[in-house]
Swiss-Prot record:
InterPro entries: ACP, ACP-like_sf, PKS_PP-bd, PP-bd_ACP, Ppantetheine_attach_site. Carrier of the growing fatty acid chain in fatty acid biosynthesis. PROSITE patterns: CARRIER (PS50075), PHOSPHOPANTETHEINE (PS00012). This is Acyl carrier protein. The keyword Cytoplasm applies. It holds the Pfam family PP-binding. The gene is acpP. It comes from Helicobacter pylori (strain G27). The keyword Cytoplasm applies. It comes from the Bacteria. Pathway: Lipid metabolism; fatty acid biosynthesis. It is found in: Cytoplasm. One of its GO terms (cellular component) is cytosol. Keywords: Cytoplasm, Fatty acid biosynthesis, Fatty acid metabolism, Lipid biosynthesis, Lipid metabolism, Phosphopantetheine, Phosphoprotein.
Amino acid sequence: MALFEDIQAVIAEQLNVDAAQVTPEAEFVKDLGADSLDVVELIMALEEKFGVEIPDEQAEKIVNVGDVVKYIEDNKLA
């Protein structure tokens, strides 16, 4: 399974949305109905699943699904 699909599955499960809604352009708050606590819990789930650390200052810059995919791609092997 490709990285995007893995991330898509985690996001869909955490936010209780259909995976089809989780597109690279989908914004967590505006499009997927997440509140600030949902976003924090999602970041923690992604950190655990993919073995990356997403510092708060980076998490604040992650607005949509594409942002988180890029961050994990760039930092997963670091």
